[in-house]
Amino acid sequence: MRIGHGYDVHKLVEGRKLIMGGVDIPWEKGLLGHSDADVLLHAIADAILGALGEGDIGKHFPDTDPAYKGADSLKLLEHVANLAIAKGYCLGNLDATIIAQRPKMAPHIPAMRENIARVLRSTVDRVNVKATTEEGLSFTGRGEGISAHAVVLMIGKG
């Protein structure tokens, strides 16, 4: 068994879609980034890569590589899942937290969990996603950005 932790943050800007957990969330702003800037999936990918001892998403998907411009983070997470499988690991469980003042994430969490479980070839009961605010404090509390943390337990198959 191996444990990994991931964290990601992106700035909120006008003129971008807000994608979280592979779900397009209707909102006046979106996250700025080289890919679709899905902080939840990026944190999860980082956690899995950490558990595998494989660095981070910047190593695997550099923001200097035009191949990842506008990339769908579900595809990036799928690549990480395939790497885990190739190394003989599967998801034991995942616990993630989105930190955002607005918009409310709760209505979208079931769809996020389904997307994540599907891409990781797991079941929804092994994927937990929750959301919180920072009560108006810090950059997320002021609505300047959104961040996410993820912790994974990866289980060796052999």
Curated annotation (Swiss-Prot):
GO molecular function: 2-C-methyl-D-erythritol 2,4-cyclodiphosphate synthase activity; metal ion binding
Leader peptide range in chain numbering: none
Cofactor comment text: Binds 1 divalent metal cation per subunit.
Organism: Pelobacter propionicus (strain DSM 2379 / NBRC 103807 / OttBd1)
Cofactor(s) it depends on: a divalent metal cation
Keywords on record: Isoprene biosynthesis, Lyase, Metal-binding
Annotated family: Belongs to the IspF family.
Protein's GO biological process: isopentenyl diphosphate biosynthetic process, methylerythritol 4-phosphate pathway; terpenoid biosynthetic process
Organismal lineage: Bacteria, Pseudomonadati, Thermodesulfobacteriota, Desulfuromonadia, Desulfuromonadales
Name listed for the protein in its UniProt record: 2-C-methyl-D-erythritol 2,4-cyclodiphosphate synthase
Protein purpose: Involved in the biosynthesis of isopentenyl diphosphate (IPP) and dimethylallyl diphosphate (DMAPP), two major building blocks of isoprenoid compounds. Catalyzes the conversion of 4-diphosphocytidyl-2-C-methyl-D-erythritol 2-phosphate (CDP-ME2P) to 2-C-methyl-D-erythritol 2,4-cyclodiphosphate (ME-CPP) with a corresponding release of cytidine 5-monophosphate (CMP).
Subunit composition and interactions: Homotrimer.
InterPro entries listed in its UniProt record: MECDP_synthase, MECDP_synthase_CS, MECDP_synthase_sf
HAMAP family: IspF
Enzyme Commission (EC) number: 4.6.1.12
